[in-house]
Amino acid sequence: RLQQTRSEDVFQAYINAFAMTYDPHTNYLSPDSAENFDINMSLSLEGIGAVLQSDNEHVKVVRLVPAGPAEKSKQISPADKIVGVGQGDDEIVDVIGWRLDEVVKLIRGPKGSKVRLEVIPASNAPNDMTSKVVSITREAVKLEEQAAKKSILKLEQGGRPYKLGIIEVPAFYLDFKAFRAGDPDYKSTTRDVKKLITELQADKVDGIVIDLRNNGGGSLQEATELTGLFIDKGPTVLVRNSDGRVDVLADEQDGAFYKGPMAVLVNRLSASASEIFAGAMQDYHRALILGGQTFGKGTVQTIQPLNHGELKLTLAKFYRVSGQSTQHRGVVPDLSLIHI
């Protein structure tokens, strides 16, 4: 691994070490890191729709994204090993011993373009290294498995059955590019959760639980928008800028989208935007907060494009509607359930 370290890796590590001496949340993103950050926020990419991992000197297929180009092609399967990559009709490049991120960069590409993969099928005998070449047309891939999702938990209390709707929110994502371009189908946490609530109400659930465990945050805008689904109207978070000015972000729409019983699950890894949402639900007495004390991040970052990569820069602090800061304090649950 040390031999595979590039100068770009060293530069990123050095700049981030320097930045952290001033602020733990300001960091530099190399072009590759910036691309992955954008993918995680938009939940979309252009490629073949395969999750890969390093396996000694090879790159192995872990799973295929449902309805993605790789799955639809029916030419590769989980546990197959990729040993070569070619662009269109170009010669295939041997990638044995390559870093995972470098192989991924070769496989990703504009939708409509073709990539050829030299693959050792998992169905081969243990020592059979016979390979085959497959051609896959890249497409826009939606990472739905990383989006908010729902389930229903059936319980019985006092002889009466209850149904709880569970909405797991892994991150506060927002496709900034599509949103700014006016795309009516842009991806966002709030839009997905709103749809899931509608489906759960159709299933006649008795209450809803928003699961923010291990949710490290994301878009400040989405934290505000999601809060607005559950409150009548009013401020959602206070943002204090470096010049001392305080901006009040608020839900301006009358009426809550969902008015029924609800709870919010949090743990030590619930941070930033998760703490804004959980704190607002607690301050408005809108939901019961369950779990463990949250991470304790109370700052706001913005992305500054650079000639080479991006800078995630801290520019403000945020405060709960009550005026309290979550920095180093987190959100203390109403009911502590340490082991969930």
Where are these regions (language model features)?
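Metal-dependent DNA phosphodiester-chemistry modules and their immediately adjacent helices/loops
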Residues: S270-S272, G309, L313-Q327, V331
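Amphipathic alpha-helical
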Residues: Q12-N36
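Cleft-lining beta-strand/loop regions that shape enzyme active-site pockets
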Residues: Q3, L29-I39, L43-L45, S54, ...
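A short acidic/small-residue loop/turn micro-motif
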Residues: D90, P333-D334
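Long, structured ligand/cofactor-binding scaffold of large enzymes
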Residues: R1-I15
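Conserved small/polar residues in nucleotide/adenosyl-binding loops
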Residues: I338-I340
